């Protein structure tokens, strides 16, 4: 029996770090089909210099994907560059894009700023 393979990517964006409210995250949860583009966006509190994207796969430790200092990349050693891109063009909001989504991308994606 032929069944189309679906990629269920659950993406949770959690704010961590600074104690002041004001971090906007969209979407908080995301389920997508295999091959689709996933765009995660986070807007930190005003004045935050650093932003960090993390990924935690099931039963594994959390791993840093990329860090920005304002719009410049500070660390990107954990970023799988073949299908993942991240940017912080204006030094405030940041996006993480996955394209095309694959089953191995199923994880919790976290964002922090400070």
UniProtKB/Swiss-Prot annotation:
Gene Ontology BP term (one)? adaptive immune response
The compartments listed are:
Cell membrane
Q: Name one Pfam family in it.
A: V-set
The keyword Signal appears for this protein: yes
What PANTHER family does the record tag this protein with? NON-FUNCTIONAL T CELL RECEPTOR BETA VARIABLE 17-RELATED, T-CELL RECEPTOR BETA CHAIN
Q: How does it assemble?
A: Most probably, the alpha-beta TR is not assembled due to incorrect folding of the beta chain. Alpha-beta TR is a heterodimer composed of an alpha and beta chain; disulfide-linked. The alpha-beta TR is associated with the transmembrane signaling CD3 coreceptor proteins to form the TR-CD3 (TcR or TCR). The assembly of alpha-beta TR heterodimers with CD3 occurs in the endoplasmic reticulum where a single alpha-beta TR heterodimer associates with one CD3D-CD3E heterodimer, one CD3G-CD3E heterodimer and one CD247 homodimer forming a stable octameric structure.
Name used for this protein in its record: Probable non-functional T cell receptor beta variable 17
Q: Which organism is it from?
A: Homo sapiens
